[in-house]
Amino acid sequence: MNSLDFDRKPEDTRVVVAMSGGVDSSVVAGLLKREGYDVLGITLQLYDHGAAVHRAGSCCAGQDIDDARRVCETIGIPHYVLDYEARFRETVINPFAESYIAGETPIPCVACNQTVKFADLLATAKELGADALATGHYIRSRPSPKPRYAGQRALYRPADAERDQSYFLFATTQEQIDYLRFPLGGLPKSETRALAEEMGLVVAKKADSQDICFVPQGKYSDIVSKLKPNAALAGEIVHLDGRVLGAHEGILHYTIGQRRGIGVATGEPLYVVYLDSRSRRVIVGPKEALETRRVYLRDVNWLGDEELEAAAGQGFECFAKVRSTRRPAPAVLKSDAEGLYVELVEGEAGVAPGQACALYSGTGEDARVYGGGFIRRSEREPAAEAALKALLQAPAAA
């Protein structure tokens, strides 16, 4: 077996590397070339507009494409650029804006992986005769430990917990996992940068990408307002107890858990606890009203060994992440008449619809990824949940 788990020599194994123009994917290409693989680099042009072209911390824009080209020249592999701008707008940017208007907190990186990168680019890699598509994600995959799943691969958290990207890859299907390879899963980021220096890559000191790639300076409301100029509709700011505290200029300017910049002064610390898109109300309350114990899921991608229905029906003990920056915490996957849900044993504050809930076998670097789903709705502590339901049943002021 070679290092990518193929039963052939590296020189007889063709690998397409998804190159964003950053240090991680560049090192992947360099490592595979060094090992003797037949490597092709492909960069997707996803957008190339105005300030985004030269904005530090972006990805897949003009400067990044040029950096990827220079890296490929340095290591001696072919480089191709594919224009996926229309596809990216259709499947990632527009749904992002629509989700925000609906009062959700979307994760466009998951949509990008599942539509553009792991669907379209993966299909292109196969058309080019590649045996695998390699990326610079910090996650591990290896052959399934179960004999009954021989030939399949499983996902695991990476060695560098600070760089763990498994949360954004929970929706990766089994077919995609079997074709993908993640050479950086066993490396710390510091070693990746050291390798880039050693290889003489122009991106060795390049800053990591930050925030959402198509959102300048992380101002989500700006991109939503630009795409949906009529979406910023005014409404009320309402306390959980029913008091109308003020007015707002559009729920797209708020997120669940927000405290600063709410626009009301009451002498008590208030947080955004719910965004009522139907009645255009921003509902606020005390911090304890953010505490979430249960999240209902949609679009679940299950990677466990048991059948999903059987596992949830019995109560499947696992660990869950509802934010990319948190460690997996104890949870139980269950189901009822409404559908699949996850009980968060220790609770979590400020969980919003649209976020992901990724499931794991444990908390360590070798924990297996069981998949997950998008949060459809969450349930708070009983008192806050009852107050919210009563408020949502009451009509908003005209």
UniProtKB/Swiss-Prot annotation:
Major localisation: cytoplasm
GO molecular function terms attached to this record: ATP binding; tRNA binding; tRNA-uridine 2-sulfurtransferase activity
Coiled-coil regions listed: none
Broad class of enzyme this protein falls into: transferase
Biological process according to GO: tRNA wobble position uridine thiolation
EC number: 2.8.1.13
Catalytic activity, reaction form: S-sulfanyl-L-cysteinyl-[protein] + uridine(34) in tRNA + AH2 + ATP = 2-thiouridine(34) in tRNA + L-cysteinyl-[protein] + A + AMP + diphosphate + H(+)
GO cellular component: cytoplasm
Pfam families: tRNA_Me_trans (PF03054), tRNA_Me_trans_C (PF20258), tRNA_Me_trans_M (PF20259)
Chain segments carrying region Interaction with tRNA: 163-165
Annotated positions binding ATP: A18, M19, S20, G21, G22, V23, D24, S25, L44, G136
Residues annotated as site: Interaction with tRNA: H137, Q355
Active site per the UniProt annotation: C112 (nucleophile), C213 (cysteine persulfide intermediate)
Name by which UniProt lists this protein: tRNA-specific 2-thiouridylase MnmA
